[in-house]
């Protein structure tokens, strides 16, 4: 039995959905512990492409409990669309559970998110415009609406009074947007509550019962380490804590319950939205990575910025998450390159540094120092074990493991489930050196 946290080791979009889907085969419970519909993961099953934003990837396994935890923010309209999509694809969603204390993204959150981002002009953060930040802000101000509030009309009427009055004032007087109608919102969201009610549970009790019965629990993070509110490239971050420590807060468990932390990292680096990106590429190689890697956001559809693998942010992710092992994804995207570069240090103000500057202004000034490695220039898409990989691909993986000082447990070579080399199952396997 092992309880495992899966986190993104870069700026999100690392392929966590596929890795979580893979590990969910061995999990009894999968818990999404933070974020909202600003996240997106794509899973390919039997040539079907399923795009999810809120529901954990484990929903594809009939016997698995999939819990949207207390640390998430839920847009019930989008959640119900996901539920309907899964049902239409013949997927049983009886295992879906939603924490009664998850906060709800309301219509005024989305409107404010879009208006505030537009108002920033050239200083925009790159938000998805899905209302995530304003929802978390209301939560912190103790002014939020929770899933449990959608189950009782009197309760909803009471708790919406103050935030709606406040938000309508902002929308109308500052942004020139027509105020929202209270009764219309209440009617709409009570209907959402009624449709979701059979899935609503006490998050902490559900997880505690599973742990007491020695079940395998998988904690699924959204976004990535460098988007963490406290430890990322602030202010170009999300509004929650994707790092492994966020699993304890968002799921309501103690750190001693966590047995292992696996970080997911692409074989190169991407970022969507604004913010510093030391290894960002321009020109033909950037276009090649973007096209071969289908680097367009699941949530926004925006083209992702692409760059070489950054070992400095990788080592930072190892440290702040306490990573036990890595899953390296999209190795196949590098197949056609004759030379691959990896950032091994930065130059900041004329001095070489080997650490991640937590000040975004300093990070913007950092120039990457690269190590050049030979490419393999042949397809890896059909490799199913390490011995199938070209020698230079193996050398590349070994170099990443040595640079980040953490073993590699999984290598992904495409979107399909079977395009994966599992060196060791992070749930069932013992902790030992892999690819080092």
From Swiss-Prot:
GO terms for biological process: 'de novo' AMP biosynthetic process; IMP metabolic process. It is an enzyme of class 6 (ligase). Substrate binds at residues 298-304. Its EC number is 6.3.4.4. The keyword Magnesium applies. Binds 1 Mg(2+) ion per subunit. One of its GO terms (molecular function) is magnesium ion binding. Its cofactor is Mg(2+). Pathway: Purine metabolism; AMP biosynthesis via de novo pathway; AMP from IMP: step 1/2. Plays an important role in the de novo pathway of purine nucleotide biosynthesis. Catalyzes the first committed step in the biosynthesis of AMP from IMP. This is Adenylosuccinate synthetase. It comes from Prochlorococcus marinus subsp. pastoris (strain CCMP1986 / NIES-2087 / MED4).
């Amino acid at each position: 039995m092992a309880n495992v946290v899966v986190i993104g080791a870069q700026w999100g979009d690392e392929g966590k959905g596929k890795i979580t889907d893979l590990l969910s085969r061995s999990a009894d419970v999968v818990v999404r512990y933070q974020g909202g519909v600003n996240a997106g993961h794509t899973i390919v099953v039997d040539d079907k492409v399923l795009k999810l934003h809120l529901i954990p990837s484990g929903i594809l396994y009939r016997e698995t409990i999939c819990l949207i935890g207390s640390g998430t923010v839920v847009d019930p309209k989008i959640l119900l669309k996901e539920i309907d999509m899964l049902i239409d694809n013949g997927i049983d969603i009886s295992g879906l559970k939603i924490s009664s204390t998850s906060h709800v993204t309301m219509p005024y959150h989305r409107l404010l998110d879009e208006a505030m981002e537009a108002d920033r002009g050239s200083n925009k953060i790159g938000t998805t415009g899905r209302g995530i930040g304003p929802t978390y802000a209301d939560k912190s101000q103790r002014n939020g609406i929770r899933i449990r509030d959608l189950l009782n009309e009197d309760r909803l009427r009471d708790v919406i009074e103050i935030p709606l009055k406040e938000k309508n004032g902002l929308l109308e007087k500052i942004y020139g947007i027509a105020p929202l109608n209270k009764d219309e919102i209440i009617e709409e969201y009570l209907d959402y509550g009624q449709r979701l009610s059979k899935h609503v549970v006490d998050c902490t009790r559900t997880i505690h019962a599973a742990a007491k019965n020695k079940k395998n629990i998988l904690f699924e993070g959204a976004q990535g380490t460098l988007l963490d509110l406290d430890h990322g490239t602030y202010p170009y971050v999300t509004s929650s804590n994707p790092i492994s420590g966020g699993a304890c807060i968002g799921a309501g468990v103690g750190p001693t319950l966590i047995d292992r932390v696996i970080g997911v990292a692409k074989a190169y680096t991407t970022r969507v939205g604004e913010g510093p990106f030391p290894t960002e590429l321009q020109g033909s190689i950037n276009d090649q990575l973007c096209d071969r890697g289908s680097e367009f956001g699941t949530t926004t559809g925006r083209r992702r910025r692409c760059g070489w693998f950054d070992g400095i942010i990788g080592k930072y992710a190892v440290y702040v998450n306490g990573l036990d092992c890595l899953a390296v994804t999209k190795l196949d995207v590098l197949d056609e390159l004759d030379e691959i570069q990896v950032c091994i240090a930065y130059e900041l103000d004329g001095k070489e540094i080997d650490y991640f500057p937590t000040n975004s202004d300093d990070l913007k000034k950092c120039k990457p120092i690269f190590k050049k490695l030979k490419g393999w220039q042949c397809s890896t898409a059909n490799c199913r074990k390490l011995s199938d990989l070209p020698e230079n691909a193996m050398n590349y993986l070994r170099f990443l493991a040595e640079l980040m000082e953490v073993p590699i447990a999984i290598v992904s070579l495409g979107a399909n489930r079977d395009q994966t080399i599992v060196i060791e199952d992070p749930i069932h396997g013992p902790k030992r050196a892999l690819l080092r």
